[in-house]
Regions:
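Short beta-strand micro-motifs enriched in acidic
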Residues: 48-52
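Negatively charged, low-complexity tracts enriched in Asp/Glu with abundant Ser/Thr
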Residues: 1-42, 62-81, 85, 92-103
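Short, well-ordered strand-loop elements centered on a beta-strand within folded domains, enriched
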Residues: 53-64
Length: 103
């Protein structure tokens, strides 16, 4: 079965990316889904969902080695300020940290 993945973020995802100020956040495709993404070195942030008005956002923090989710925030409303606050907290805790510091 082939799934169609749009090449661009949805308008709501673009709004969030613009609110976050663009760089260091960017568009990426993870598991066939357009997501907002940020590389933190040993960790990655994936912001998925939010494609439609009724679809909530989810934030996942991934450890790259071994590949696993270490933190998740799900069912987040389209509240850009709240999402940015969560992301700022995540960045402060995970940016340029070694994997074992969060165990």
């Amino acid at each position: 079965m082939t799934f169609y993945t749009p090449k661009n973020l949805s308008p709501r995802q673009k709004d969030l990316l613009n609110y976050l100020g663009g760089k260091p956040y960017c568009k990426n495709i993870i598991d066939g889904e357009n997501v907002v993404y940020r590389d933190l070195g040993v960790y990655d942030i994936e912001i998925s969902g939010g494609h439609r008005k009724t679809q909530t956002f989810a934030i996942y923090v991934w450890c790259k080695e071994p590949l696993r989710i270490v933190e998740r925030h799900v069912r987040l409303p389209h509240d850009h300020a709240m999402i940015k606050d969560i992301l700022d907290d995540i960045v402060a805790r995970y940016s340029d940290k070694e994997e074992n510091e969060h165990e």
